[in-house]
Each structure stands twice: as C-alpha cells, then as structure tokens.
C-alpha cells in the first residue's frame, strides 16, 4: 500500500490528509488469480480519486501504475499482464516489447470453471527461477546469435553453448510463444473454434508441467477430472 502511495506521488498526486480503508475480497489468495493485482489496481484507482486534486486516469494508466506498485518498486520478477488485464477488464492481448501495446478482444468464449486447489504457491520463487534462467540463456545465445529476437526467432538458432536443460527451457519459451500466436489468431476470428482454444490451453499446461515443473499432483487430478467431465481444455493459473 505504501508503494502505491509513492508511485502516485511520483505521478503528481498529493495527499494532505490521511484516510482509513477496509478491503474485502472473494478472490483466492496466492492461487494464480491476480488477487494482488486486483488490490493494487483498486488501490491506485482509489488514490487517484481521493487525492487533493483527483486525477482522471484511464484504465491503461491505472494498469501501468499498478505494475510499478507491485513489481518495479520492489524490483520483483514478474510480467505486467495481471495488472493491465485487471485494469482494462475483459480479454486483452498484451505485448510488452519493444513498446507496450494492448489489443482488446471480445470473443464469445463461453463459460470457464476456476478451481482452487487450496495449495499455496510461491509465486516469486517460480517467477524468479524462470526469469533468471531465461535471462542467462538469452545472454549465452547472443554470443552466436547476435540478431536474436525472441518474438521471431525460429529453428535456425545456434544452441551449441546451451546445456540440455537450458535447451529444454528455451524451447519451452518458443513453444509458449507459438501457442500464444496461435491463440491470438483464433481469438481474433468472428467465430472462434472452442476446441482449438481448449487444446491450446492444455498444450500450454503441458509445457508448464513437464518443462517448467509448476504443477502438482492435486492439480493434475483436478485437470483430469475436468477433462473427463467434458471440459475442452485447461491449464494451471499463476
């Protein structure tokens, strides 16, 4: 909460008096459902309205400041999709480099079932492990592939300097990138194919489980039960 006030002050807001707040939420905590981002976005929005001179920030600006509040202020690992998705609402495609670009999508996805395994996860550890390993891999690859660009690089890269473990992690990154591109193509259609979206979700989960090791036996049991009950696909959140 203090970081949110600091971020808002850096953005030009001033607060000449204090205030008392009570927060209630039904979002599961530490369950991959963006509970912290929901609080950050709501907090920034509240601060923008309660300031001495209220700010008329739009949803994108609130998402940007929520990201700074949660990630940049603490130098934590993590992307910005949770903050922008929560602030913008509905479904978005977010591209974070070379510049931030947000595309609002409005597909007819139908119902989703969100299951809570009630197993707490160490989000920061998972994100840090994956981020640090990827950064090291990218630095190694640039030695033999000076024009490396993760958004378009293909099978022509020289992976000689990578260990087998690093090759697996890099290929997982490429697979996830390709799954995202395939999903975007489908989601932009007037009539999307729900079976394709379901398969893409499951394929993504397979990468997360088998290569990034972020699933658990209980979540796998829940996934199997959902698929056996007729779900078109599914994946772990967070």
Question: What feature does the model see in each segment?
Answer:
Residues 85, 90-235:
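C-terminal nucleotide
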Residues 1-107, 227-228:
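Gly/Ser-rich oxyanion-binding loop with an adjacent helix/lid
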